[in-house]
Amino acid sequence: MTSESTSPPVVPPLHSPKSPVWPTFPFHRESSRIWERGGGVSPRDLPSPLPTKRTRTYSATARASAGPVFKGVCKQFSRSQGHGFITPENGSEDIFVHVSDIEGEYVPVEGDEVTYKMCPIPPKNQKFQAVEVVLTQLAPHTPHETWSGQVVGS
């Protein structure tokens, strides 16, 4: 009778890389075409971190959903960066909009009429962002792209 050891095989421990691995993007936010066009939008106008539908609290979502519906016009929107701004119908300060808050099948372009509700941007809750954004009238004579990439119109 032999006494053989039935210990598990030795597995080397996992090691993480010596330097962190960061995703690379084909552009930098500050040097993207959105900033080169002008229009008064600067990196300091963007909330940081960008608030999304996914990171918003349930209570903030419920308050926004219960709030009034506003009208405005899309000032600009960058699909690649996932955000843009809406100019309110009443002429007040432009409102930030995140891609996760746009409903419907079309990517907004400058001049599209929209309806939206408003939600405060944490942590100070001094500025607002547009949520539940619906395109009500597409800008005439402007090609529009669907989220799947199909271009519609001329």
From Swiss-Prot:
PROSITE patterns assigned: CSD_1, CSD_2
Keywords: Cytoplasm, mRNA processing, Nucleus, Phosphoprotein, RNA-binding
Gene3D superfamilies documented for this protein: Nucleic acid-binding proteins (2.40.50.140)
CDD domains found in the cross-reference section: CSP_CDS
A GO term from the CC aspect: nucleus
Tissue expression remark: Brain-specific. Expression restricted to the pyramidal neurons of the cerebral cortex and in the Purkinje cells of the cerebellum.
Keyword Nucleus: yes
Superkingdom to which the source organism belongs: Eukaryota
GO biological process, one term: regulation of mRNA stability
Subcellular location per the Swiss-Prot or TrEMBL entry: Nucleus; Cytoplasm
CSD domain residues: 69-136
Modification Phosphoserine, positions: S19
SUPFAM superfamilies in UniProt: Nucleic acid-binding proteins (SSF50249)
Residue segments, region Disordered: 1-22, 36-62
InterPro entries reported for this sequence: Ca-reg_mRNA-binding_domain, CSD, CSD_CS, CSP_DNA-bd, NA-bd_OB-fold
A GO molecular-function descriptor: mRNA 3'-UTR binding
Role description: RNA-binding factor which binds specifically to the very 3'-UTR ends of both histone H1 and H3.3 mRNAs, encompassing the polyadenylation signal. Might play a central role in the negative regulation of histone variant synthesis in the developing brain.
Entry protein name: Cold shock domain-containing protein C2
Gene: Csdc2
